[in-house]
């Protein structure tokens, strides 16, 4: 495989885009979806891996670019793995994660009133690197932890303010970006395919 010189990072989530750009080497030229007027295909997969593949393959074929796609989300034990692959959709059309977080707290309270003592959760990220010749590489990263009882911190994005990784007291929302990105699910997924970008 030739050295990657430029790549299309397909995600409409600006937080994810920034984090992926920070993970990739500086010598690679990065493009965002804003450069292309292409609608995102329906995510019909039943797993993060399937949805990541759907997006990466679709946009690589449409643009003839090497494409890296991210599909990730939060799984909460008490909610039987929810919101899971629907993590982004819980935020509504306007990506209002304050709304999504409120919904999580309400649903956990519906299942168990003292859910604060039963809040095990995990973040999952699946990355798919798809080449115009049809070859692809996928990887998955998982970080285990629990949900906090309230929103904490203003860093990160999405559900970061309510997720506390195992071994830490702070939420991802309270952590410095450098620390978070050295232990989170996206970093773990990237680390497994890092060799293709060097």
Q: For the regions a protein language model found, what residue spans apply to each?
A:
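Anionic-ligand binding patches
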Residues: 2-10, 14-198
């Amino acid at each position: 495989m030739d050295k990657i010189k430029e790549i299309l990072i397909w995600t409409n989530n600006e937080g994810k885009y920034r984090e992926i750009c920070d993970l990739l080497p500086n010598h690679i030229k990065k493009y965002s979806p804003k450069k292309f007027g292409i609608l995102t295909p329906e995510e019909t997969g039943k797993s993060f891996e399937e949805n990541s593949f759907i997006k990466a393959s679709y946009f690589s074929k449409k643009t003839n670019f090497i494409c890296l796609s991210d599909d990730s989300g939060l799984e909460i034990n008490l909610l039987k793995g929810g919101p899971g692959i629907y993590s982004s959709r819980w935020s509504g059309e306007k990506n209002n994660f304050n709304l999504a977080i409120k919904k999580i707290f309400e649903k956990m309270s519906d299942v168990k009133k003292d859910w604060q003592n039963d809040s095990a959760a995990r973040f999952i990220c699946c990355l798919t690197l798809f080449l115009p010749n049809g070859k692809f590489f996928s990887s998955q990263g998982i970080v285990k932890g629990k949900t906090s009882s309230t929103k904490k911190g203003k860093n990160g994005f999405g559900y970061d303010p309510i997720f506390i990784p195992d071994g830490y007291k702070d939420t991802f929302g309270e952590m410095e970006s450098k620390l978070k990105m050295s232990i989170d699910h996206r970093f773990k997924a990237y680390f497994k395919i890092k060799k293709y970008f060097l």
